[in-house]
C-alpha cells in the first residue's frame, strides 16, 4: 500500500510540475494560463510527495515545495493599516445575490469612506440603503456580471465609466488627487474572452502607469501566479496589498480579487465570506 501511494503521489507531483511550467506560457496560449492559478494545490502535492517520497526524489520535491511556498507567501512584507487613512471596500457582490439587504448592512458596518462594487444589480432594492449612505460617485448599470459601481460618502473630483470594448472600468479621483480604479475584466473561459481580458489588463495597466498616485481594486479574473498578472504589475508599476495565498473566490478558493497600489501607503485584508462567491476586501490607504 505504501509503495502504491508513493507511486501515485510521484505521478501527481510530476503532473503538478508540468502544470506549473505550462501556466507560465499562458501569455502565448490562453488555455495554458489556466494551469497557473492552482499553485496552492500544486504546493500541497509537492509537500506530500516530499514527505512520502520515492527513493532519490525527496530533494527535488522539497525544493519545489519550498519554492511554491515562497511564491505563495509574497509579498513578504506588508505594511500595517495606516493611521487615519481612507477606507475603501471592494466587493464582487454577485449579480444574483440572494441577501442584498443583509449584505448592505454588513458593508455599512465597516464604515468605509468608499465602496467599489462588482456585479451589482442596481434594480435590486436591497442595495438602496448603500446608495443613500454613499450618494456620490458613478456606476455602470447593466444586468450582467459587468455591472460596476464606485460610491463615496464625500464628493469626488472625478468619476467616470470607461469602456474597453464591451467591458467597463471606473476611474475616480478624490479631492486630494488620488486616482481610484475599479476593474472587472471578463473570465478567460474561451479564446475570445481570454483575448478580451488580456487587452483589458494591458490597457488599464498603461492608464494606471500614468498616475502618480493610484489604487486599483477589482476582480481581475487572474491569480498572482499568472504571467498576465505579473505583466500587469510590471507595466502599471503597482504593487499588491495582499499575500498571494489569500483566497477570495469559491469554489476553488483562488486569489483573483486584488488591491494594487502606486504611490500610496496601503494595507488590505479580506472580510468574512457573505452570500457572494467572492470575499470583500477592506483597503486602507494614505499618501506617501
Summary of predicted features, one role per range:
Residues 94-108, 119-288:
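Soluble catalytic domains of enzymes that build or remodel membrane lipids, polysaccharides, and related
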